[in-house]
């Protein structure tokens, strides 16, 4: 039911601090391994889950936030605070109350006995259609529910346009898994039951003209049982739990900071938190422009590719574990810093991956580098021809090197080999210059603990499975073998 957005006395509430139960953005997609032999299905997955990844004209996918909690818990207040702090982005609020079913004549005669807090009271199918439409970047006409007549207004709607952030608010927005899986972040507002009851009494008596006895009777008969049976169990799906609702300014600040970060990321980074794209600058875009130019000289292609590769390697090293270390400076003062992970090696996927070895050696003196050769054309890129890896690779963190992630088939074969050799999946960091969305889906859905570090995510794969816009055959251009073929 609609809640009072104003603050109340929280003297009876002693809970403090936000509780983070883990940000699970990977829940948006299934974690089951994809069929890597059918690249066309991967392309379909990309187009359906992330339209802006493969179509430059498609609208940018919005960031969907679900806000749930008991009646009068402060959900609306939290939503208003988030909207205010995201003032530089377009934000729309869709309230689940708008999707109440209109009551039949029989139900209207016994409206005092109607349970408005039961899942059946809502038109979940229309709410799902609304969320899917807004997620696709299209506008939607949200119905307006009249709580006096308990019917939807047939003559007026609220037009909701595509926005950067969409907030779905309601007591049961987490109840249906189809709606829940559309959300990028799920927030549960947890407020003491006595506080919620006091708010509800004030709201229903002041705003809806009801007497206190009828409010208490409805609360005991419907609201409290529905909370215990449906609302409270959905708390387990929340990514973030906020005690004290709108009074918890620290929690709301942390949430909005996280949303700001996600809004600045590629859509695939919102889906897969283990994908890292180095921050784009004019320098990086300029180097990408140079190496993608088909008429660039081999010398310039190698020079600017090496510069970009060095940046990717440096960024990848930043994801390795570090330990605190203190050193004495020439001035005699003590400096507290960090020490690099000692157990580290590189593995290049021959032959394009060998182009990244010089940058890795320049960053990590004396590093061991293994090699894997996979026949890309035969057996759908899954034929292992050669491998030479450090004998103690299972004890090391591995930087897997391949400048272009296209279908992901060769990468999956290489990663499977490393895991067979005893390397923990979480110890593998896959470094590349450019990535296709199809390849990211293929690798991340199969190996969710692995990290991918890239300098740019391109649009898609074409019918020949080449990355578009891409940069051609990287190995041939880097080593000059394309000139020999001409």
Curated annotation (Swiss-Prot):
Superkingdom of the source species: Eukaryota
GO cellular component: chloroplast; cytoplasm
Compartments reported by the entry: Plastid, Chloroplast; Cytoplasm
Segments for region (Disordered): 31-67
Gene null: resulting phenotype: No visible phenotype under normal growth conditions. No decrease in uracil phosphoribosyltransferase activity. Loss of sensitivity to 5'-fluorouracil and 5'-fluorouridine.
Top EC class for this record: transferase
GO molecular function, one term: ATP binding
SUPFAM superfamilies in the record: P-loop containing nucleoside triphosphate hydrolases, PRTase-like
Record's protein name: Uridine/cytidine kinase UKL1, chloroplastic
Keywords: Allosteric enzyme, Chloroplast, Cytoplasm, Glycosyltransferase, GTP-binding, Kinase, Multifunctional enzyme, Nucleotide-binding, Plastid, Transferase, Transit peptide
Uracil phosphoribosyltransferase: region residues: 274-486
Positions that bind GTP: 298, 307, 341-344, 396
UniProt cross-references to Pfam families, sorted A to Z: PRK, UPRTase
Entry's EC annotation: 2.7.1.48
Binding residues for uracil: 472-474
Biological function: Involved in the pyrimidine salvage pathway. Phosphorylates uridine to uridine monophosphate (UMP). Phosphorylates cytidine to cytidine monophosphate (CMP). Does not possess uracil phosphoribosyltransferase (UPRTase) activity that catalyzes the conversion of uracil and 5-phospho-alpha-D-ribose 1-diphosphate (PRPP) to UMP and diphosphate.
Organism: Arabidopsis thaliana (Mouse-ear cress)
Keyword Transmembrane helix appears in the UniProt entry: no
Transit peptide: 1-47
Record carries keyword Chloroplast: yes
InterPro entries: P-loop_NTPase, PRibTrfase_dom, PRK/URK, PRTase-like, Uridine_kinase-like
Uridine kinase: annotated span: 59-264
């Amino acid at each position: 039911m609609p809640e009072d957005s104003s603050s109340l006395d929280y003297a009876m509430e002693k809970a403090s601090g936000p509780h983070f139960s883990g940000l699970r953005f990977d829940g948006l997609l299934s974690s089951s391994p994809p069929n890597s032999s059918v690249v066309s299905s991967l392309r379909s997955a990309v187009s359906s889950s992330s339209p802006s990844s493969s179509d430059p004209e498609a609208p940018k996918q919005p960031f969907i936030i679900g806000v749930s909690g008991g009646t009068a818990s402060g959900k609306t207040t939290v939503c208003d605070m988030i909207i205010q702090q995201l003032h530089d982005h377009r934000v729309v609020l869709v309230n689940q109350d708008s999707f109440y079913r209109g009551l039949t004549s029989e139900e209207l005669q016994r409206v005092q006995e109607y349970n408005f807090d039961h899942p059946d009271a809502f038109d979940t199918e229309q709410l799902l259609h609304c969320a899917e439409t807004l997620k696709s970047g299209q506008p939607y006409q949200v119905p307006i529910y009249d709580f006096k007549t308990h019917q939807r207004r047939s003559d007026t709607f609220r037009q909701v346009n595509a926005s950067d952030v969409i907030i779905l608010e309601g007591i049961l927005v987490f109840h249906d898994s189809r709606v829940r899986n559309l959300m990028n972040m799920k927030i549960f507002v947890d407020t003491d039951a006595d506080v919620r009851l006091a708010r509800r009494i004030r709201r229903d008596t002041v705003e809806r003209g009801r007497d206190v006895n009828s409010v208490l009777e409805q609360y005991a008969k419907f609201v409290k049982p529905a909370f215990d049976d449906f609302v409270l169990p959905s708390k387990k799906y929340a990514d973030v739990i906020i005690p004290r609702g709108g009074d918890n300014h620290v929690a709301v600040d942390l949430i909005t900071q996280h949303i700001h970060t996600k809004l600045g990321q590629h859509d695939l980074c919102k889906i897969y938190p283990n994908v890292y794209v180095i921050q784009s600058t004019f320098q990086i875009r300029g180097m990408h422009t140079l190496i993608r130019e088909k008429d660039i000289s081999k010398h310039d292609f190698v020079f600017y590719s090496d510069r970009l590769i060095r940046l990717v390697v440096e960024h990848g090293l930043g994801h390795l574990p570090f330990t605190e270390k203190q050193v004495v400076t020439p001035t005699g003062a003590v400096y507290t810093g960090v020490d690099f992970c000692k157990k580290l090696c590189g593995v290049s996927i021959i032959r394009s991956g060998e182009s990244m070895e010089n940058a890795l050696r320049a960053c990590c003196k004396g590093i061991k580098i293994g090699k894997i050769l996979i026949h890309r054309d035969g057996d759908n890129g899954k034929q292992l021809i050669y491998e030479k890896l450090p004998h103690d690779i299972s004890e090391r963190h591995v930087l897997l090197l391949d400048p272009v992630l296209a279908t992901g088939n060769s990468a999956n074969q290489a990663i499977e080999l490393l895991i067979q050799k005893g390397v923990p999946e979480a110890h593998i960091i896959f470094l590349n210059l450019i990535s296709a969305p199809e390849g990211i889906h293929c690798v991340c859905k199969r190996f969710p603990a692995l990290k991918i570090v890239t300098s740019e995510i391109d649009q898609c794969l074409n019918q020949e499975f080449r990355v578009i816009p891409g940069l051609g055959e990287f190995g041939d251009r880097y080593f000059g073998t394309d000139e020999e073929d001409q």
